From Swiss-Prot:
Position of the signal peptide: 1-21
Name of encoding gene: pfl9
Function field: May be involved in agglutination during conjugation or other aspects of colony formation. Induces flocculation when overexpressed.
InterPro entries per the UniProt record, alphabetical: DIPSY, S_pombe_Mam3/Map4
Keyword flag Glycoprotein: yes
Ranges of the Sequence repeats in the UniProt entry: 103-137, 138-175
Protein name: Putative cell agglutination protein pfl9
Domain DIPSY per the UniProt entry, residue ranges: 164-326
Glycan-bearing residues: 25
Length: 326
């Protein structure tokens, strides 16, 4: 069991809700009765906008089971917040773009008119149990944030006759590279050879001139400057770093397909040869990678390329390059 640190909010003289952080990759919610209370639950981790707020590894599931598990750890109360309140007798699901640092799990529980938050900081795959005291009957909401730049997925549960004692198990998968799935990336057809690809975590993702700058780069000197290991998540069709960071590519704001920055507009397809092709999600039309003189990896749509007549006008050092693993 990993060593973890806990912070928990609670009130006395009330039933217990147990939140257990475990490991592995699950995507569905299972429902069972908790001391004869009928629980209704919902979960949504779908994309809601730009790169930073789109669903990525890790996913999780919430399981409701009977009774209290022996050997659980009780964490004592420290403080309380009343923000983000959920009304009684309402089931609802929400997704936001809030995120926290890698290797941190945050579970937020709303009951009646109060909000409680548990933060567990430890290894990439925290495994342990925390015990939460719910002060009022009615509904409670569990919210999980895991890793960096991933959405908050919220599950609201309504009991049939008040809040019942029981266990809520939050299963959080390990996320990232393994010897079997990790690789380096390179750019083929770049004017600099070899051209290695890396994500610069210090590069601001910002709007600059006509473009929205990303943090994915090709080396400018033919060396491995800051070279990353990556892996491919076929569920979200993206290349991610080993700590589950999602690189962003530079785009033109006026690009009618991807200029809005929404990740739902495109997918990254990996073929059997390890070549990654960006495509429009609506019709699988190919998008194009380019590299500018600063090493930024750009992406453009065919619609935008046609409008401006020639990518040569954009002062790229290489047009229509190929992203490939090695």
């Amino acid at each position: 069991m990993n060593v973890v640190k806990y912070i928990i909010f609670s009130f006395a003289l009330a039933p217990l809700l147990l939140v257990n952080a475990n490991t592995y990759n699950f995507t569905q919610i299972q429902k069972r009765s908790v001391n004869q209370a009928v629980l209704e639950s919902s979960q949504d981790t779908n994309s809601v906008g730009g790169e930073a707020s789109s669903t990525a590894c890790p996913l999780f599931t919430t399981i409701y089971t009977n009774g209290i598990t022996p050997g659980t750890t009780t964490i004592y109360p420290t403080s309380i917040s009343t923000s983000g309140v959920s009304s009684n007798n309402i089931d609802e699901t929400s997704v936001s773009s809030e995120s926290i640092i890698t290797s941190t799990i945050t579970t937020t529980i709303t009951s009646g008119s109060q909000l409680y938050t548990t933060t567990i900081t430890g290894q990439n795959t925290p495994v342990d149990t925390v015990e939460v005291v719910i002060p009022t009957a009615g509904t409670f909401t569990t919210t999980l944030t895991s890793g960096s730049s991933y959405p908050v997925a919220t599950t609201t549960v309504r009991t049939a006759s008040g809040t019942q004692s029981g266990e809520v198990e939050v299963i959080t998968p390990s996320c990232g590279c393994s010897p079997e799935n990790s690789f380096h990336l390179k750019i083929d057809n770049d004017k600099i050879s070899p051209s290695y690809v890396y994500m610069d975590p210090n590069a601001p993702v910002r709007t600059n001139g006509a473009g929205r700058e990303g943090n994915m780069f090709a080396s400018t000197n033919g060396d491995n400057e800051g070279l990353n290991l990556f892996y491919y998540d076929s569920t979200i069709q993206r290349v991610l770093t080993c700590d589950c960071q999602r690189p962003s590519y530079t785009v033109y704001i006026e690009d009618p397909i991807i200029g809005n920055g929404f990740s739902s507009a495109w997918n990254l397809i990996k073929n059997s040869d390890g070549i990654f092709t960006p495509v429009e999600s609506r019709n699988n039309e190919p998008l194009h990678f380019h590299v500018d003189n600063n090493g930024r990896v750009w992406m453009t749509s065919q619609e935008y390329d046609t409008e401006v007549s020639s990518t040569d006008e954009r002062n790229f050092r290489a047009n229509d390059v190929t992203l490939q693993l090695y």
